[in-house]
Amino acid sequence: MEKKDLNVVCAVIHDGDRFLCTQRLRKGPDYIAEHWELPGGKVKEGENDYEALRRELHEEMDWNIYVGAKLGSIEHEYPDFIVRLTAYDCMAHDKDFKLLEHIDACWLRPEEFTKLNWTEADAALIKQLWK
């Protein structure tokens, strides 16, 4: 059976030297449920990355953001799908977001990222962005 390809975008949002990290809900496969990620989501057919990222953060966090430059991209193969994860430099006018689709959120410095249990794709992307 051929694996499904997913195009996913994520936001790198900083407040000074700290970056926003979000924890996934307790749903989906064990290898991603409750793991940490950079906020974002899937790109729908007919959307560009910028539209998808703004839509996802509005739907999942009731938060309006500005999507800036592309920072990097990785491809990762999970047991039942392949994800292409692309990060964008984003800005928010405030920190007034809601956790509508996440368990938790925190602001960490890159050297603190190892404290969290990241999805494999996000861990690979973080390694690339903060090498």
Feature locations, PLM:
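Short secondary-structure boundary/capping segments
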Residues: K3, A11-V12, K27-P29, E75, ...
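Conserved Nudix-box catalytic region and its N-terminal flanking loop in Nudix hydrolases
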Residues: R18-E59
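Conserved N-terminal beta-strand and adjoining loop/helix that marks the start
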Residues: M1-L20, K42
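NUDIX/MutT-family hydrolases
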Residues: D89, K98-L129
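A generic structural micro-feature
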Residues: E2-D5, I32-H35, P79-R84, L99
